[in-house]
Amino acid sequence: MVPHEFVTTAYDLPGYRVTRNFGIVRGIVVRSRSILGTLGAGLQTMVGGNISIFSNLCEQTRSDAFELMIQHAGQLGANAVIGMQYDATEIMQGVTEVLAYGTAVEVVPASK
């Protein structure tokens, strides 16, 4: 399993050096909004501000995609992920794909 602190958007991990590259890893989650959630969000738009129903859904979806990416990296034998990014695409109205991806690597302390 890859520790969360060994996942970075940078292309290196300070204090460590890459000894092996396992390639691209990803976690993909596809979510749809429920009818009730859409109605609740519609009511929130009337008063303005943050639409918490969608914010919470987005945050949970990103978290799920992140965990799937870490799981994928661990299955390959990696202990870190570098160059991590998120992407999102609306597949159809109300259905969104969230992708977390990066490069799975093995790192060791730089002093070794």
UniProtKB/Swiss-Prot annotation:
Domain of life of the organism encoding this protein: Bacteria
Pfam (any one) = YbjQ_1
SUPFAM superfamilies attached here? YbjQ-like
What family name appears in the similarity comment? Answer: Belongs to the UPF0145 family.
Q: Which HAMAP family match?
A: UPF0145
Q: This chain belongs to which protein, by name? A: UPF0145 protein Acid_4599
**Native source organism of the sequence:** Solibacter usitatus (strain Ellin6076)
